[in-house]
From Swiss-Prot, chain A:
GO terms for biological process: protein urmylation; tRNA wobble position uridine thiolation. InterPro entries: CTU2, Rossmann-like_a/b/a_fold. Pathway: tRNA modification; 5-methoxycarbonylmethyl-2-thiouridine-tRNA biosynthesis. It comes from Oryza sativa subsp. japonica. It is found in: Cytoplasm. This is Cytoplasmic tRNA 2-thiolation protein 2.
């Protein structure tokens, strides 16, 4: 989400050319200059879809579209993603994660429009149809770590509120949660622990990734406490492309497919990504065309691998606008995990009958979810990580060793402080929602060990 | 770490890589792909040393490809000829002129600087195999280092080349083919190779190819160097990711076959080299470059670059020849 918010228009978005010549390059440069001047992707040619004479907008793939068709194109992708992956059922309440950036702003707008349309259908059918899904909005307030003046932050958050309340049919609720609340319900204690934990992380990239983990934890907490069935993120193709490369660079090739699918049910509350096929440039442009208000003053400056990857991809995009889609498509060909689809019994009962066979086929193929997930980031463990975990379990002396072994190699390297004392202190600061799970496993583990020891003692007695 | 200890650690790491991956067996005849550059020169030197020290019992040869680039390849081949004498390894040189009837100088005259790397990469790969067959060797080793492999992982993600992505981290490729290729430097950093060559005062040629003067500075290579500065282990992390990628079983992979004209391995009816050569000989050098209309199915195994618009290709061009797996 942060990556998506940080994206910006990068000049001309012409589709790829099969060949180039000097004159074509000159025309291209002129078009690029003109596009840069108006600050948007635009070319003066007819809409490729309806033939209208309005100023056309170029989308990846080279097709020029007028404003209306461009918008319909993006909305169509959103709706297709939602329906063909059964992301939202009529009985669901959906929590939309809103950061203030263009991508989540578009997601907010589109899910709102889908809901309005569903309500109209429901009204017309005299309540005989299925109920309409609910929508709530969540904003994670990370201002405690922000170096900007307090009043500026307050104004920005007020903007966030007004954007949400400005939607014609009110959303169910607006939830603004402070990031430190995942540490403790007491404000000062939570803040202290958050600051202390973040300060212990020496690696810039590690700090960023740690905050990303906390953000997801915060969203999960909001959703669980308020009865939401789904969490919808505004992650777009551009942000996902950045994530694909970042994860590759961090050695997370095994787990990366988990993060790039439409559906992710490894969390308590399933997470869905309906904007996965849309580019940040397109979403930013749509916000401009539709005068959708965004709020990006809360974005934090970024150092480290994630921002290096983002600038690399930005550079590639300038040369070939389809590059981001290519990266996402490559990742799509990697094997997803069993939790990358809905598999609970009866989940697809609400689907129109023509769609049900597709999902039922998957249901019958379903295997048990057996992945071990990283304590912090939720990444599935690779074989070498599993081996490390198994060997640690056998010889673990302290709880700290189990905690450490339940972190993936990437988190171990870039987040955990070096040194055992520091490590112990770091884990003592972490949210109970994370370490509590470990404590439960640890307790059952030691219980099992006690039983084994009793058995050995009995065996010994018999021997005597 | 002092110089002597660096030598020991460097050589032992490569030895461990060779042993753990069972790259060779006693009696193997091994051709070292030798370009005269630092990677292949260090590889020839280290392999020769380890062969003596650890008694691999290998017959080692130097195998060079002469692309026919005036002012560049002829000078680098002089370096390899000196290596032949210094290391006592027999040298075989095979040229594009002999194999294809065209030198790179001729090819560049025909098509210009753009795209000439496609020809060179495809031709060199096949030339290396043909030279190895002439020497009757069991294995080919190349000097691809960790930086090269990490770069290839990234490039294959950027290009959407899932077939290559699934195998570009293999330390041995072509095991089911006539002559497997090995990369003993898979886990060795480029800067360590440079340092080793420098301290050992090894004789190597370091000028970049004159027909792709900016190839070394491709976006991907630049990105990897930035990464390495920020987090040195990123290169090995990329390789580890590449090793851990699991390709979805629903993804269709190209089928292996042979070229009906020259018998070389290919997933198409004609291998890429024959397609390119046919274009050259018919005065249509652009044939086989860029988007191919009417050709269905996966890429040819010989194809160096994915079919992409010309404009985007230059930025993704890696170091000369080294992205060709």
């Amino acid at each position: 989400m942060a990556a998506a918010a940080a994206s910006s228009c990068g000049g001309a978005g012409c589709g790829p050319h099969c060949s180039s010549s000097a004159s074509a390059a000159a025309v291209e440069d002129a078009a690029a200059a003109a596009a840069e001047k108006v600050g948007r992707l635009s070319l003066s040619r007819e809409c490729g879809k309806c033939g209208g004479g309005a100023a056309a907008v170029a989308v990846a793939g080279g097709l020029g579209l007028c404003g209306e068709c461009f918008r319909a194109n993006l909305l169509g992708k959103f709706k297709l993603a939602v329906t063909s992956n059964a992301m939202v059922r009529p009985t669901d309440s959906v929590l939309l994660a809103f950061s203030g950036g263009p991508a989540s702003r578009v997601a907010l707008q589109f899910i709102h429009e889908m809901r309005c349309k569903a309500i109209e259908s429901w009204d017309v059918s005299n309540s005989q149809a299925l109920p309409v899904f609910g929508v709530g909005v969540a904003f994670v307030d990370e201002s405690v770590l922000c170096s900007k003046p307090r009043d500026e932050i307050e104004m920005a958050i007020e903007d966030i509120r007004s954007i949400v309340s400005s939607l014609s049919t009110g959303v169910k609720a607006m939830h603004i949660a402070r990031l430190e609340d995942v540490f403790s319900t007491e404000s000062e204690d939570g803040e202290r622990r958050l600051r202390e934990a973040v300060d212990m992380i020496g690696d810039d990239t590690g700090r960023e990734d740690f905050l990303r983990c906390l953000r997801m934890l915060s969203l999960q907490k909001i959703a669980m406490e308020n009865g939401y069935a789904k969490i919808m993120l505004g992650s777009c193709a551009s942000a996902i492309a950045c994530h694909v490369l970042s994860a590759t660079v961090k050695g997370q090739g095994y787990s990366l497919p988990a993060d790039v699918q439409y559906v992710d049910t490894r969390w308590e509350i399933p997470v869905v990504l309906p904007l996965r096929d849309c580019l940040a440039q397109e979403l930013t442009l749509l916000c401009e065309l539709d005068s959708l208000k965004t709020q990006q003053h809360l974005d934090r400056p970024s150092n480290g691998i994630n921002s290096l990857v983002a600038s690399f991809i930005k550079r590639l995009r300038e040369e070939n606008p389809s590059r981001e889609h290519t990266i996402v498509r490559t990742a799509q060909k990697l094997k997803p995990f069993s939790f990358n689809k809905f598999s609970a019994d009866g989940y697809h009962d609400f689907l129109p009958s023509r769609l049900r066979p597709k999902f039922q086929k998957f249901d019958s193929d379903e295997s048990t979810f057996s992945e071990i997930l990283c304590l912090m980031c939720g990444s599935p463990f690779s074989e070498s990580e599993l081996q490390n975990l198994e060997s640690t379990k056998h010889k673990a002396q302290k709880k700290i060793d189990l905690y450490t072994a339940h972190c993936c190699q990437s988190c171990y390297f870039q987040i955990l402080p070096a040194g055992e004392n520091l490590n112990e202190h770091f884990f003592s600061l972490l949210p109970k929602l994370w370490t509590g799970k470990m404590d439960t496993i640890s307790d059952s583990h030691s219980l099992l060990r006690d039983q084994i020891e009793e058995y050995l003692l009995e065996e010994n007695d018999d021997g005597n | 770490i002092c110089r002597e200890c660096f030598y020991i650690v460097f050589e032992d790491e490569i030895h461990q890589t060779i042993v753990e991956n069972n790259l060779f067996k006693p009696g193997d005849r091994v051709a070292i792909g030798a370009s005269g550059g630092k990677d292949s020169t260090v590889l020839a030197y280290v392999l020769s040393e380890l062969n003596h020290r650890h008694k691999y019992c290998l017959d080692l040869f130097l195998l060079s490809v002469d692309e026919g680039i005036t002012g560049y390849r002829d000078d680098s081949l002089e370096t390899v000829k000196r290596n032949e004498i210094q290391y006592g390894l027999p040298l075989k040189i095979i040229s594009y002129k002999d194999l294809y009837g065209w030198t790179m100088d001729d090819i560049v005259k025909a098509i210009g600087l753009k795209n000439n790397c496609t020809f060179c990469g495809v031709f060199r790969r096949q030339a290396l195999d043909r030279g190895a067959a002439l020497l009757k060797v069991d294995k080919i080793v190349t000097g691809h280092n960790a930086d090269d492999i990490a770069e290839t992982v990234l490039l294959n993600i950027l290009r959407g080349d899932i077939a290559r992505l699934s195998r570009c981290t293999f330390i041995t490729t072509g095991e089911d083919g006539p002559i497997p290729r090995c990369k003993p430097f898979k886990y060795t950093y480029e800067k360590e190779i440079v340092m080793y060559a420098y301290f050992k005062k090894l004789d190597y040629f370091s000028t970049e190819c004159i027909y792709s003067p900016n190839a070394y500075r491709g976006f991907a290579r630049e990105f990897i160097k930035d990464l390495e500065r920020m987090r040195p282990r990123a290169i090995l992390d990329i390789i580890k990711s590449g090793e851990n990628f699991r390709i979805s079983t629903t993804t269709r992979m190209p089928e292996q076959g042979t070229c009906e004209r020259c018998g070389y391995i290919s997933s198409q009816k004609l291998c890429k080299a024959c397609v390119l050569l046919d274009g050259l000989n018919r005065g249509l050098p652009k044939l086989g470059i860029g988007r191919t209309k009417g050709v269905a199915g996966g890429d040819s195994d010989c194809e160096q670059q994915a079919k992409r618009p010309e404009r985007s290709r230059s930025s993704l061009q890696g170091k000369h020849g080294n992205v060709d797996f």
